[in-house]
Every structure is written in C-alpha cells, then in structure tokens.
C-alpha cells in the first residue's frame, strides 16, 4: 500500500488561514458585487450607463435618479406598506413560534418527532404550489386587497424555520430556572416570557430578522393578493418603474437602493445578536 507525501507548505495552505481567507473573500465579493453595482448604477446618468466600453464607476455621481424615483411613483408609500406588513407579520411570527417552540421543547408530547418532521416537510414546499390555495382562502375570507392578506401568509411561511430555530435554544435553557420562577409566583407563561425568552434573545432576534427580511422581499403573494394601488408593497412597486419599451435602470437602481437601506440598517444594528444567534443555533442544533 503506497502513500503520497505532501509538502508541509502545501498542507498548511489547504488546512490553514490562507485558504479560508480566499474562500471568504470569494463569498464576500459574490455577495456584495450585485449590491455595489446597483449603487453605482443609481448614481449614473442614462447616457453614461449605455456608453461603451462600460464604465465601472460613475464619472459624475448624481442624486437625480433618487429624486425621480420618488416623483415617478409613490415610493414612500411602497416603503410604508412594506414596513408595516413586515413588522406586523414578524411580531405575529415571533409570538406564535415562541409558544410553539416552547411547547415542543418542554412538554412531553407523544408525537413530538412526527410534529418536528411535519414542520420540516412544510418548510420545503415551493411557494408557487401554495399560491392558488392561499388565494382561495383569502378570497373566501374576504381579505384580498388588505394588509391582512399578506400578513397571515407571511407568518405561516416563516413559522417553520423560526420554530425549529427556537426549539434548539429553549432546549438549552435549564428547567430549574423556570421552576424557580414559578416557585416565586410566576405562571408558566410568565416564566416563559420573563426568564426563557430573555435568555434566548439572540435566537429570538435572529428569527425576527429572518421573518422580517422574508416579508420585506416577497413579491409573488404581494402581486397576486393585492390590486389596490394604495396598498402596494416595495417589490411590486419597483416593477412599475419599467415601461412597455423603456427600462430606466438608473431610476430602478435608485429605488432598489432605497429598499435595501432599511434592511441593511436593521442587520447592522443587530448584527452581533444575529451572528451569535446563528452560531449558537447551529451548535445547539
């Protein structure tokens, strides 16, 4: 049986920091390049965008595209609708997922494994397969053309992932802490929200961010369930900037940047909690 010798330098390269740095750099560039390109495009004029050869950086940056984005369409209204729908669906998602995850983590349920398996299975359903059933439900309940028609489906779609994430966090909290709180007079629900949830804050914040971003970015349901111009969300509103034969990419890019900024700010503010929540969830899971 023969062995192939490898040089110490090559072995240290593939197992050490250089390879990890290169891989991280590739992932970073792959993730940031589209956003940076959109930002540069939003600062260019239409003439500069179509010139050849392509210019990477805007020669004379302008904010005219941003002003036009707000004047051509009610971008502020799109932002408000998206924010309210995302905020309300996130709050509802966190409330239900906290209660569901706590029950799965603490109660001796007979079919716990089956329930967890069903949650995982539901989370894999493609959204397009749920479109018609959800539409029929919303129409039967007379909820079309309302925020509720989006808030409820967004909550349902985010619940599986958020619940599974929080189950692992709740299982890591010693039961003695809850028992001590209940001895001091807390109810079980009181112990949950006063003791367990604060200790699982990174996981709760991470689940909230995921639910918020999912609702903020969603397009298909927002387009299908709402035909009221006053209730359009940002993804649906942005498509209105393009005409039948015209695609004002600088203006569209400006609207996209405006839509990215709130989510970026949210992630920057809570980045430590999100990172700790993702890493802790991965270790506990």
UniProtKB/Swiss-Prot annotation:
It comes from the Bacteria. Residues 79-270 form the ABC transmembrane type-1 domain. It is a multi-pass membrane protein. Coiled coil: none annotated. The chain crosses the membrane at residues 21-41, 83-103, 115-135, 150-170, 195-215, 250-270. GO terms for biological process: transmembrane transport. SUPFAM superfamilies: MetI-like (SSF161098). It holds the Pfam family BPD_transp_1. It is found in: Cell inner membrane. Keywords: Cell inner membrane, Cell membrane, Membrane, Sugar transport, Transmembrane, Transmembrane helix, Transport. One of its GO terms (cellular component) is plasma membrane. PROSITE patterns: ABC_TM1 (PS50928). Part of the ABC transporter complex SmoEFGH involved in sulfoquinovosyl glycerol (SQGro) uptake. Responsible for the translocation of the substrate across the membrane. The complex is probably composed of two ATP-binding proteins (SmoE), two transmembrane proteins (SmoG and SmoH) and a solute-binding protein (SmoF). This is Sulfoquinovosyl glycerol transport system permease protein SmoH. It comes from Agrobacterium fabrum (strain C58 / ATCC 33970) (Agrobacterium tumefaciens (strain C58)).
């Amino acid at each position: 049986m023969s062995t192939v010798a490898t040089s110490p330098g090559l072995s240290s390269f593939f197992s050490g920091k250089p390879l990890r740095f290169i891989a991280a750099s590739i992932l970073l560039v792959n993730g940031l390049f589209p956003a940076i390109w959109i930002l540069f495009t939003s600062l260019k004029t239409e003439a500069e965008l179509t010139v050849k050869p392509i210019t990477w950086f805007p020669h004379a940056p302008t904010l005219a595209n941003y002003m036009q984005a707000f004047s051509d369409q009610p971008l502020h209204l799109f932002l408000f609708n998206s924010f309210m729908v995302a905020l309300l669906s996130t709050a509802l998602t966190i409330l239900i997922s906290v209660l569901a995850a706590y029950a799965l983590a603490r109660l001796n349920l007979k079919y716990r494994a089956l329930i967890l398996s069903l949650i995982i299975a539901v989370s894999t359903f493609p959204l397009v397969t749920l479109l018609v059933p959800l539409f029929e439900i919303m129409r039967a309940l007379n909820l079309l053309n309302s925020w509720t028609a989006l808030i409820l489906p967004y909550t349902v779609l985010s619940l599986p992932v958020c619940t599974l994430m929080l189950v692992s966090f709740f299982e890591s909290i010693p039961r003695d802490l809850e028992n001590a709180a209940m001895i001091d007079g807390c109810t079980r629900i009181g112990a949950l929200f006063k003791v367990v949830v604060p200790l699982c804050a990174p996981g709760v914040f991470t689940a909230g961010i995921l639910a918020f971003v999912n609702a903020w970015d969603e397009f298909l349901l927002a387009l299908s369930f709402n035909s009221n111009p006053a209730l359009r969300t940002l993804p649906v509103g942005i498509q209105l900037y393009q005409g039948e034969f015209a695609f004002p990419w600088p203006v569209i890019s400006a609207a996209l940047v405006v839509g990215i900024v709130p989510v970026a700010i949210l992630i920057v503010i809570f980045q430590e909690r999100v990172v700790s929540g993702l890493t802790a969830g991965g270790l506990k899971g």
